[in-house]
Amino acid sequence: MTSSADSGRDAAWLDDFLALTLAGDAPPAEAGECAARAVRWRWLGDGLLRLEPADAAQRMQSVLVSAGVHGDETAPIELLSTLVRDIARGALPLRCRLLVALGNPGAMRAGERYLDDDLNRLFGGRHAQLAASREAPRAAQLEAAAALFFSTAGRARGARWHIDMHTAIRTSVFEQFALLPHTGEPPTRTMFEWLGEAQIAAVLLHTTKGSTFSHFTAQACGALACTLELGKVMPFGANDLSRFAPADAAVRRLVSGRRDAPRGALPRAFTVVDQITKQSDALELFVANDVPNFTPFARGTLLARDGDYRYAVRHEQERIVFPNPSVKPGLRAGLLVIETTRDTHAALA
């Protein structure tokens, strides 16, 4: 029988989940207890950790929180490691089944966005098309971990959540914003209210199925899923985490089952109307490197040229998000969105 002292020693690494992951180490045991035996934990592999209350109820929420799908997006990784520490110490009560995922440990250790291919473009089985990529087996592993985790989750609305935390390459008109995957259903008021509580200023609504982690969990696992963009890419240790306090607090309230959050304003909504796809390395993107995400452009403005391909603004005003001419040919070099706040809020399910 494992003693309380042995259990505490085995769980000491939970004080710095990030350090263990960056070192590429495994914990001394694969399962144990923490938080004075109030929480059970199981290490599921590199950067993967499941936590659940010792008295977990059958109808308890199941929440997946991920960060580091892009290895250089350090602030959310640090927030997530601190969340694990506080749960393990008993400083933050756990009132859900929680799966913690540091998405791309190899890229995190290298200090790079990715090693071979953008991991957040390889979900929904797309990894099978790039079998030689070092990101491909990780995408398959994350899919399997999420599917297994949610396979025993409740099916009521709001029983399954996935919060995938990122930071952006560029600054943004809205410093912190969210992206909701396309599911064929209207977005939920539950998600919009939670994003308002997190003081997320804007939400981008996808209109086609995608290959991101949050698309996979929404489509394949039935989760209320979102991608959070919480600021700008910075090196480990250089982040001012206080800038992310509202979003961090909202995640903590979600996993601790608290319902005492002040209701924030619903975020503004923007719907994707088109994208710029890189046809070749000859792509010219007429958007300067210092242009923030969500910058508006007027009808007729030429934004991209690539051989015979042109993209000019078709609506009275379109805003560009994630302009990036450095992506590989065939991938998205920018999203174009229009504001749909009134209609989106009216249609919330």
From Swiss-Prot:
It is an enzyme of class 3 (hydrolase). Its cofactor is Zn(2+). The active site is at 229. Disulfide bonds: none annotated. GO terms for molecular function: hydrolase activity, acting on ester bonds; succinylglutamate desuccinylase activity; zinc ion binding. The gene is astE. InterPro entries: AspA/AstE_fam, AstE_AspA_cat, Aste_AspA_hybrid_dom, SuccinylGlu_desuccinylase. It comes from the Bacteria. This is Succinylglutamate desuccinylase. Its EC number is 3.5.1.96. Pathway: Amino-acid degradation; L-arginine degradation via AST pathway; L-glutamate and succinate from L-arginine: step 5/5. It holds the Pfam family AstE_AspA_cat. The keyword Ion transport does not apply. It catalyses: N-succinyl-L-glutamate + H2O = L-glutamate + succinate. Zn(2+) binds at residues 70, 73, 166. It comes from Burkholderia mallei (strain ATCC 23344). Binds 1 zinc ion per subunit. Transforms N(2)-succinylglutamate into succinate and glutamate. Belongs to the AspA/AstE family. Succinylglutamate desuccinylase subfamily.
